[in-house]
Amino acid sequence: MAYDAFGKPGYGPDFNSAFSPGMGGGAGFNEYDQSSQPSVDRQQGAGNKLRPVTIKQILNASQVHADAEFKIDGVEVGQVTFVGVLRNIHAQTTNTTYQIEDGTGMIEVRHWEHIDALSELATDTYVRVYGNIKIFSGKIYIASQYIRTIKDHNEVHFHFLEAIAVHLHFTQKANAVNGANAPGYGTSNALGYNNISSNGAANSLEQKLAEYSLTPAQMTVMQAIHSAPETNEGVHVRQLAQSVGPGIDLTAVTDFLQQEGIIYTTIDENHFKSVLQDQ
């Protein structure tokens, strides 16, 4: 499930995944093409354990002192991997910076090597990032070794499930040591995803929408709207398209949902909010 040196499973010596090792980090999506991956020192240690995280977890990472490893869930982390939508690219003389957001937050990613493979990256597409957490002038950013475009949207969903599983592993272990009750699925605050965390949030939305008898496609769009960060402007149709993936006629679905009075436009015809978010 986790990877040592971008390939070997294992978040740590005591992590026994409920998933098969071959599923680690979306390995089912053939992401580990060794010919295109950066070389990594294979020594064991926190700095060489690749951990799946959300951007919120990165931004909330802590250090004991300036030279210490960053910690997430009280555990030292070195290399991290996350997925998100590439919002901005800024090429400079010595490096290229990318602004990436995943619904839990936004972070700057810096890449110092000019690799031809990165030229295929485009804004408003999902990417996977590998790198290390750094801080400069009080601002956390990611020093990236590798960034690639995500071609199978299932990888996005799998990543968040994996991040939840690892988060629960470490937090449940800590609670057990401290004699506290092990948490169920209350992971939304730590991970930043209010609607990915539990049966509760998802089921609550489904219960509220039950009276509308929505199709699976319409329900998928509603879930995407509620999963996006809640703002006064709502969610842009472009972000919705990225979230729901291909195969859904987004125009037809949003038109229907507007006619039913379930969603409405805000600052322009491309931004939508759910009426349930106002309740």
Swiss-Prot record:
Among CDD domains, the record links this protein to:
RPA2_DBD_D
Q: A Pfam family matched by this chain, by name? A: tRNA_anti-codon
* Gene Ontology CC: chromosome, telomeric region; cytosol; DNA replication factor A complex; nucleus; RNA polymerase I complex; site of double-strand break
| Residues spanning the membrane | none
DNA-binding region coordinates: 80-140
Q: Which UniProt keywords apply?
A: DNA replication, DNA-binding, Nucleus, Phosphoprotein
Q: Between which residues do disulfide bridges form?
A: none
What does the PTM comment of the record read? Phosphorylated in a cell cycle-dependent manner. Hypophosphorylated in G1, becomes phosphorylated at the G1/S boundary, it is maintained in this state through the M phase.
Q: How does it assemble?
A: Heterotrimer of 68, 30, and 12 kDa chains.
Identify the main location. nucleus
Q: Which GO terms describe its molecular function?
A: telomeric DNA binding
Q: Which family does it belong to?
A: Belongs to the replication factor A protein 2 family.
Return the protein name. Replication factor A protein 2
Known role: Binds to single-stranded sequences.
Matches recorded under PANTHER family? REPLICATION PROTEIN A-RELATED, REPLICATION PROTEIN A2
Locations listed in the record: Nucleus
Q: Which organism is this protein's natural source? A: Schizosaccharomyces pombe (strain 972 / ATCC 24843) (Fission yeast)
Q: Tell me which Gene3D superfamilies the record gives.
A: Nucleic acid-binding proteins, Winged helix-like DNA-binding domain superfamily/Winged helix DNA-binding domain
Q: Where does this protein have compositionally biased stretches of type Polar residues?
A: 32-46
Annotated GO biological process: DNA replication; DNA replication, synthesis of primer; double-strand break repair via homologous recombination; nucleotide-excision repair; transcription elongation by RNA polymerase I
Q: Which InterPro entries match?
A: NA-bd_OB-fold (IPR012340), NA-bd_OB_tRNA (IPR004365), RFA2-like (IPR040260), Rfa2/RPA32 (IPR014646), RPA_C (IPR014892), WH-like_DNA-bd_sf (IPR036388), WH_DNA-bd_sf (IPR036390)
In this chain, the stretch annotated as Disordered covers 26-47
